[in-house]
Amino acid sequence: MLGGIEAGGTKFVCAVGREDGTIIDRIEFPTKMPDETIEKVIQYFSQFSLQAIGIGSFGPVDNDKTSQTYGTITATPKAGWRHYPFLQTVKNEMKIPVGFSTDVNAAALGEFLFGEAKGLDSCLYITIGTGIGAGAIVEGRLLQGLSHPEMGHIYIRRHPDDVYQGKCPYHGDCFEGLASGPAIEARWGKKAADLSDIAQVWELEGYYIAQALAQYILILAPKKIILGGGVMQQKQVFSYIYQYVPKIMNSYLDFSELSDDISDYIVPPRLGSNAGIIGTLVLAHQALQAEAASGEVRS
C-alpha cells in the first residue's frame, strides 16, 4: 500500500492507494503551521502499513535530487513554511521511502499515466487558480533543469483594452499576474465564481491563456495540454481558448490538433480534482522502485 500527500497552500490532501492509481482512503484538512500540519499527516498514515509515500508540494521547492536541500520548500510566502525540510521530515517520521515533487508535477504524472495523456510520451499540465503553475512531461519524464518549470511567470502580450496592472508581486503583468484567480478578482472586483455569466471576463481570460499556450506549444510541442485548477472550473473559458490559439499560431504549425481537433488537444483533466493525489501515489511507487534498485529496500 502506498501513501500520497498533496500539499496545497490552503489545504492538505492525504490518501492511501495502489500503484494503479486506485484511491482506498483519503482525508483533507487545512494547511496550518508546519508542526501542526505534519502531525496530522503522520497520525493519518500511522493507521496503515505503507511501503512508501509520495509528496506533491506547493512551492517553490528544491526539486534537485543532487542538492543538499532536496525536498525543501524554499521562497514561499506561506507563513512558517519558508525553507521547511518537507521531504526529510516525513522520511524521518515514517522511516519508509518518500518521493517528492511539486503539486502540479504530481497532477501531470497522474494525467500522464491514468488520464488524458495516457499512452502518449509527452504532455503539459497547467493549473490556473490562486497561482499558475505547470508540469511538463517530455519523452516520458518530468521536465527538470536548474529548477522545476515556473511557467506561470512568462510574459504575455497584454490585451489592448486591458488597463489592469497585474497581480504578481515579482513581475506585475506576467501570465500569473494577469490571469490567475486573484488577478481576475482584482480586475473585476468579484471572485471568478461570481463572474460566470459575464462573457467579457472569460473572453479576456481565454485570450491570456491562449497567449501562454502558444508559447508552450512552440517550445515544448506537447502531445496533449491539460488545463486544471479553480479558474478552469469555468468551462466557458475553453471556447475562447479554442478560438484564440489557432489565431495566434496563424497556421505556423500545420497540425490538426491546432485546428480541427483542438478540443481534443486542449482539455480539462480526466481525473478531475484527483489528478494530483493520484500523481503522489505514482511518486511513492517511483521512490519504492528506486530504493529497491539501490538494494536498500526494507524486507
Swiss-Prot record:
Residues binding Zn(2+): 153, 168, 171, 174
GO biological process: polysaccharide catabolic process
EC number(s) from the headed UniProt entry: 2.7.1.4
Keyword Iron in record: no
Pfam families (UniProt xref): ROK
Cofactor(s) the protein requires to work: Mg(2+)
A single MF term (Gene Ontology): metal ion binding
Induction context: Up-regulated by konjac glucomannan and by cellobiose and mannobiose, the possible degradation products of glucomannan. Repressed by glucose via the carbon catabolite repression system. Also repressed by GmuR.
Binding of ATP, residues: 130, 182, 230-234
Keywords linked to the UniProt accession: ATP-binding, Carbohydrate metabolism, Kinase, Magnesium, Metal-binding, Nucleotide-binding, Polysaccharide degradation, Transferase, Zinc
Region forming the signal peptide: none
Transmembrane segment boundaries: none
Keyword Zinc set for record: yes
Regulation: Inhibited by zinc ions.
Family: Belongs to the ROK (NagC/XylR) family.
Role played: Seems to be involved in the degradation of glucomannan.
Annotated protein name in UniProt: Putative fructokinase
Organism, as annotated: Bacillus subtilis (strain 168)
